[in-house]
Amino acid sequence: MKEMNLSSPNKARKSLREQVESVSIYVVDNLWDQPAIYCGTYKKYNEGSLFGAWLDLRMFDSYEEFMDVCKQLHADEEDPELMFQDYQCFPAEWYSESCMDEEVFDKIIAFIQMDDDKQKAFKAYVSATGDDSISDFEDNYE
C-alpha cells in the first residue's frame, strides 16, 4: 500500500488546493484512456461547487485505500458524502453516482487488469448474456 498522510477532518482545515496536493499521486493528469472516476461530494455540489478530482483507479491497491483517498480529498468536510460525478474506461453497469462498494471496486480492478482483447470479449459477453460476473466470463472464455 502506498504511504499516505491522512489527517482527521477535525484538525486544522486544509485549503482545497492542499487537499488535492495531498492525494496528487492518485489524480489523473491527462484524461485519455485510463480508468478513472471523478470524486466530489453532495455537499459541495448542492452549494454550487464541482470541486473534486479525477482519480486514476490503476493507482489503488485496495478499496480501503480508494476510500481513504476520497475522504482525504474532501477533508474539509467532517463526514463527506461522496458523489462520483463521472467515470471512464470501465463498464457503465458498474457506475453509480452515489456509491462504489467494495464488490464493484474489485470488479473494476479485475477488468482493468485484463488486456484489451479480453476486455472486448468481456464487454461482448455482458452484452450477450447480461451477466457481468467476471468469474462466469472467465469460465466461458477459457
What are these language model-derived features?
Residues 1-142:
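Acidic interaction surfaces
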